[in-house]
Amino acid sequence: MQPPSLLLLVLGLLAAPAAALVRIPLHKFTSVRRTMTELGGPVEDLIAKGPISKYAQGAPAVTGGPIPEMLRNYMDAQYYGEIGIGTPPQCFTVVFDTGSSNLWVPSIHCKLLDIACWIHHKYNSGKSSTYVKNGTSFDIHYGSGSLSGYLSQDTVSVPCKSALSGLAGIKVERQTFGEATKQPGITFIAAKFDGILGMAYPRISVNNVLPVFDNLMQQKLVEKNIFSFYLNRDPNAQPGGELMLGGTDSKYYKGPLSYLNVTRKAYWQVHMEQVDVGSSLTLCKGGCEAIVDTGTSLIVGPVDEVRELQKAIGAVPLIQGEYMIPCEKVSTLPDVTLKLGGKLYKLSSEDYTLKVSQGGKTICLSGFMGMDIPPPGGPLWILGDVFIGCYYTVFDRDQNRVGLAQATRL
């Protein structure tokens, strides 16, 4: 006969829900900025107040106080995946964004004049058996306007319909999220995604809503409280990458992971020692702070420093806030090397230039953009998809650190 303590342990393990390892395929689409540029749209109007506004302040004020401009306009977001909300799941395409902390999707009750709502999937609480009314209003400020609506609670499925896709999935119960009834400007009309799933820390969550990954952690749905991103740099590859919840996949990276401690638990913020452009220019002298952000496609830094960087790589400004590099010169340009945790992370000219179509022609754009982020949130560098595409990135909530390793070219 088994000892009672061992029997209880076995029964406990059988009764406990199995911690999952969840893979979410990511798909790469043309960004809003590129879509508007190719159509000849007024992109400069969208970026007049800065291409990114979510870093304007360090954290939102308490409920009832003024909420700062926490989220950017997502003009440069490119990688999206699918989740489900409700029972049965209603599917939505979302940006998995490590630079914000809230989940929101369009609501079936959106305003009549909200054109973006017409052309995206909408959440219908009346079709969900697990919906719980909340009703608290929420308001997220953007450079181009204000996204608003009200909070609701329901089950979130990741991915949306895992049984049909053959993927392992999890259900995060009792998740509070935003039903957007008003979306600002024209940004979301051109967007290929329905909503945003924020994966940063609770500190920057609007209305102090518990983020999806924190709720997932509390419900012990994954073995390790980590998630990792692989972004495929091949523009024609599908899927465009993979988000893994609960672990890492060594097929996506070479060598060991090197870890950086999070310096401030709001965004995924780390210390960066310096940035070298070839052997002729050093930026971030004496060290600086950087955000690792899956929701931004570019690498962003202080305006004056990035202006020097653009000059050093021969990039010239375009009216839409982008910089162009002559494609024939790309192979001759210097490496840009970021020093993080005492290790060097090199970006070749092929890594930091983006080939895009404009007016039927291929042009090359710089993967860097200048923006000054004021205190208390800034100054900051933002390491977006240009960097993450080169370095497989692990976000570790158990030990509050970010892991990096050279990404595999598949």
UniProtKB/Swiss-Prot annotation:
CDD domains: Cathepsin_D2
Pfam families noted in UniProt: A1_Propeptide, Asp
Post-translational modification: N- and O-glycosylated. Undergoes proteolytic cleavage and activation by ADAM30.
UniProt-listed Gene3D superfamilies: Acid Proteases
Entry-listed glycosylation sites: 134, 261
Alphabetized UniProt keyword annotations: Aspartyl protease, Disulfide bond, Glycoprotein, Hydrolase, Lysosome, Protease, Secreted, Signal, Zymogen
One of the GO biological process terms: insulin catabolic process
EC numbers on record: 3.4.23.5
Top EC class, one word: hydrolase
Domain Peptidase A1 stretches: 79-405
Localization: Lysosome; Melanosome; Secreted, Extracellular space
Chief location of this protein within or outside the cell: other
Family: Belongs to the peptidase A1 family.
Protein known as: Cathepsin D
Annotated organism of origin: Canis lupus familiaris (Dog)
Lineage, broadest ranks: Eukaryota, Metazoa, Chordata, Craniata, Vertebrata
